[in-house]
Amino acid sequence: MADELKMEKIDMVISLGGNFVSKKIKEMLRNTDICEHWEINKSGRPHDIFEHQTGIAMSSEIKFLSALLKRTRNNHIHPDNLKKLLTPYISKALNMIEGFTPSYSQYMAVRELELSLEDVDYDFVMHYANSMAVRLGCLCFSKRYIYCNRGINGIEGSISTAAGFSLATNTMVFCVTGDLSFFYDQNALWNSRLNGNLRIMLLNNGGGSIFYRLNGLDTSDMSMSYISGKHHTDARGICEQNDIGYLAAHNTEEYHNALVRFLTEQTKRPMVMEVFTDYKSDNLVLDQLDEQFSNVQKITSAENLQSRASDEIVPFRE
């Protein structure tokens, strides 16, 4: 989808916060030098995540947005204009996602988990570990706040973060993690004080499949061993040695059977549900989803939307 977006439509990019998860959007914005990029950063420390930063506005996000609202309040810009511009695309995209039926894969696992959590009768919080887990969570368009261990590009501490959170609350704490992040931080499960309110869904496809989606790495002879960390490890032994409940799924039927126990079974100790998939199948499903997004973008072209709304949208001018 990113390839089809017309860069000349972007006058300015304003970024707030820290690192940017989506590599596709980063690549899209890095491939244009037409628009300005201003970062809102109280410290003044540059990040230049799109590699053509114009400058930094040294301010807190709240103060900046408040000042922007004050400056533009009388320029006839109204939220309804933007809503009119974006609603057709967003509606079609949401309908597409709801109608998309993924085959057995990591995306299916996360989607089914999120859908099932809408029907539970207890409070809970959701953690997504890092990298692919975070991306899959974002694809589900959850209306709930989610926590993630996304720092720069590290995978360390994902399980420790969720485990520590679970000790500070009686609420159910769910954590969705990839295999590398889980095994890297398995020592978090040594803690004998952990309780049954910690539930970990482990997505195991034998390595870091995100790397196969990056241009160039998919053809590298070294990618499997030295970049994606290919392995043949599972979490059963780790769970047994730490008195952690363990469930496993290798197909759709096993997944749904395990998911019921994962969400409802009362335990005194944490539970891990390990979902085994194949990285090629995982990436195929994501490719299919990308294609659907591209089709939505073509049908609801930004050019047509802009022309229909141009009579009402008055751009800000200093």
Protein language model annotation of sequence segments:
Residues 1-86, 192, 214-215, 263, ...:
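Glycine-rich, acidic loop regions that bind phosphate or pyrophosphate groups
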Residues 10, 53, 123-124, 178, ...:
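Local beta-strand N-terminus motif with an aromatic residue
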Residues 17-21, 43, 131-133, 180, ...:
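Short glycine-rich anion-binding loops that position phosphate/pyrophosphate groups of nucleotides
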Residues 21-25, 110, 133-137, 183-186, ...:
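Short, well-ordered alpha-helical microsegments
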Residues 86-170, 316-317:
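Active-site diphosphate/adenylate-binding microenvironment
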Residues 139-318:
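Thiamine diphosphate
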